[in-house]
Each structure stands twice: as C-alpha cells, then as structure tokens.
Amino acid sequence: MAADDKIEELIREIAAKHGIAVGRDDPILILQTINMKLMQDSASAQQEILDAFKSELESIAHRWGDDAKGKAERTLNAALAASKDAMTRGMQEGAKAAAEAVRREVEAVTAQLVAPIREARRVAMMNMVAAGMAVVAAGLALWASL
C-alpha cells in the first residue's frame, strides 16, 4: 500500500509542477516503478556488502587483538626471563663476595694463630723432652737403688 501512496503522491506532484495529467498506466510511472525497484535492490546489495565488510573488520580487529596480546605476553616473558637472569647473576655475585670475605677472614685468623701454634708446639716439645729426661732420671734412680 505504501508503493501506491508514493505513486499517487508522484502523480499529484507531476500535475502540480508541470501541469500534466499522468495516469497509472503512463510509461513514465513504469520507469518510476523500475527506478524504485532498482534503488531497493541496490540498497539491499549495499547492506549485504556493508554487513560483510563489518564482519571482516571485526575479524581483523579480533586478530589484531590476539596478535597484540601474544606480543605483550612474549614481551612480558622476555622481561621476566631477563629479570630472573639478572637476579641469578646478582645472587651468584653476592655468594662469591660472601665466600671471598669468609676466606679472607679465615686466612687472617689463621695468620694470627700461626705464631701461637708454633709457640705451643715448641713448649710441647720441651715438655716431652723434660718428661723423657724425668723418665730417664727415674730409671737411673731405680737402677742405682737396686
């Protein structure tokens, strides 16, 4: 019914503007009907093309999002790996420094104890010699008393 209203409106407009009476069976109205049909078909085809384009754009945007997410994950993983390596190196360097400090302390204490150990060894040797002499003297005293 809407198409009939449009045709009636068109007939009135032609009569008002151009002063010509046009009937429903006039060839000019056939052209108008064909033109309206072509425009409807064109609009439908354009809508289908727009829908396909929209779908393709959404697909591309989704792929870009996935790509960006993948790149972000790879970047984060690389940063984490680099951080882990740096922490490991730092811990190794700290352990080496601590071991070196302990070694130097042990060497310093050992160097300080060398002289007292020598002195203790000398005193022990003298005690052993004195003990040996006491045993020999006791042995001589025992032999002399027999």
From Swiss-Prot:
Keyword Phosphoprotein part of the UniProt annotation: no
GO BP of this protein: quorum sensing
Keyword Nuclease: no
Keyword terms: Conjugation, Plasmid
InterPro entries given in the database record: TraM
Membership in a protein family: To plasmid IncP-alpha RP4 TraM.
Protein name: Protein TraM
